[in-house]
Amino acid sequence: MDHAEQGPDRPGVDDPGRGRRIGIDVGSVRIGVASSDPDGILATPVETVPRSKERGPDAPDIRRIADIVEEYEAVEVIVGLPQTLRGERGKAASIATVFAKRLRRKVDPIPVRMADERLTTVTAARALRESGVSARGQRPVIDQAAAVAILQGWLDERSRSVNAGDSGGDAQLPEGGQ
């Protein structure tokens, strides 16, 4: 799917069903990574991967994230698509889109989706600040916190979509799941 001109993906459409999801916040210097539990309810931080200067499917950052996808036996990867509040895209969106395309080639057939990530880094920074983490202390974990926010938003929307019967796929929540 070419995301250059279209909007972000919708959770629940062509849903792969139960399994872990990996959330990715692509920055120009670092990449935040988060994972969900197998039931797709809760997102938690995994690690921060340094961006590599190399570009291509075998670049160290792509390889590390592909290893995480395999290690966690992920059924889906969610990459944040930064947009302005008006839905416009700038350089950050282009960086994320190109990265997602490279990752998609590396982890195929695992689907790589793009999720709206307006204000996730701002929200993550505010949450860290409110929990007492200094601005200097935020740097190593801000990208992970943003990845958690991206993935948790996807999981919450997926839950609403699946419960509404809007999956377009074989999505199922666990018994008693919401």
Curated annotation (Swiss-Prot):
Residues 1-21 are annotated as: Disordered. GO terms for molecular function: nuclease activity. GO terms for biological process: rRNA 5'-end processing. It holds the Pfam family RuvX. It comes from the Bacteria. Its EC number is 3.1.-.-. Keywords: Cytoplasm, Hydrolase, Nuclease, Ribosome biogenesis. It is found in: Cytoplasm. Belongs to the YqgF nuclease family. Could be a nuclease involved in processing of the 5'-end of pre-16S rRNA. This is Putative pre-16S rRNA nuclease. It comes from Rhodococcus jostii (strain RHA1).
